[in-house]
Amino acid sequence: MKPRKVMIIGAGNVGTAAAHAFVNQKFVEELILVDLNKERVEGNRKDLADAAAFMPGKMDITVRDASDCADVDIAVITVTAGPLKEGQTRLDELRSTSRIVSSIVPEMMKGGFNGIFLIATNPCDIITYQVWKLSGLPRERVLGTGVWLDTTRLRRLLAEKLDIAAQSIDAFILGEHGDSQFPVWSHSSIYGKPVNEYSVEKLGEALDLKQIGETARDTGFEIYHQKGCTEYGIGGTIVEICRHIFSGSQRALTVSCVLDGEYGESGLAIGVPAVLSQNGVKEIISLKLDEKEKEAFANSVAVIKKSIQSI
């Protein structure tokens, strides 16, 4: 079998957390680290190699330039422009990050990259769309982590309220990985029952679904303000998405996909349920949304498109 190779571009908090999660799960044969800070990335390589030695099996952990990528299966982009400086806005951050991505992706394509791009860099949906445009790859081979972490948080919150396993819950968040995301309660269930029908049966009362959705949305911001970054959750998200791609699981995850008519939209990437295969996005699942959800989706589309137009 061909060795599975993942390249992580950006060895900061998110990239390193993802690398450590890959080491712990060890389903790839080579993990490749890329960073402009050569001393830091070499230190991370050695540290991760030590961690990998405790795990069964063999994994090569190497350092390369981003352009040395012709044999890479999945390239994970986690680069950022760094924290905002005083007086800078989110738009300034977007433009700085966009410039970095604009320099990396063309070099990778010149280097013969023919794999799958997975984008974790924020703002995820905008950068995912930009990478797709820069790469010239088919849209199914460029996706972002999107709202899969937000969806997982939503399920965790429900599981904690109901004292059940999160894996028993089918609940989704769609839209932007940001303020305009929204839960799709019309397609959410627990053991085949609507969420609050199950809650009333078990707890004797309905859950405050609005509050739970807001908490799922805001948790990332809370973590950022409490510790200065988010890393472990998004690191785990990256690894899970890669695992489903390599295994060809055919499982639907809410990742950021480039739309071409789905949900009546095009010209952007946005978080929607997508079936993953070894070629990336096999199918985008178009859910029949209720009127309130349609409005929320349209709002999220408008937010993302406005940001795309600004770069």
From Swiss-Prot:
Molecular function GO terms recorded: L-lactate dehydrogenase activity
Cellular location(s): Cytoplasm
PROSITE patterns: L_LDH
Catalyzed reactions: (S)-lactate + NAD(+) = pyruvate + NADH + H(+)
Major location category of this protein: cytoplasm
N-terminal signal peptide: none
Gene Ontology terms: biological process: glycolytic process; lactate metabolic process
This protein's GO CC annotations: cytoplasm
Oxidoreductase in keyword set: yes
E.C. numbers: 1.1.1.27
Binding of NAD(+), residues: V14, D35, R40, S103, A120, T121, N122, T145
InterPro entries named among the record's database cross-references: L-lactate/malate_DH, L-lactate_DH, L-lactate_DH_AS, Lactate/malate_DH_C, Lactate/malate_DH_N, Lactate_DH/Glyco_Ohase_4_C, NAD(P)-bd_dom_sf
Keywords assigned by UniProt, alphabetized: Cytoplasm, NAD, Oxidoreductase
Residues annotated as the enzyme's active site: H177 (proton acceptor)
Residues that coordinate or bind substrate: R90, N122, P123, C124, D125, D150, T151, T152, R153, T230
Enzymatic class: oxidoreductase
Function: Catalyzes the conversion of lactate to pyruvate.
Membership in a protein family: Belongs to the LDH/MDH superfamily. LDH family.
Protein name: L-lactate dehydrogenase 2
Native source organism of the sequence: Listeria monocytogenes serotype 4b (strain F2365)
Chain's gene name: ldh2
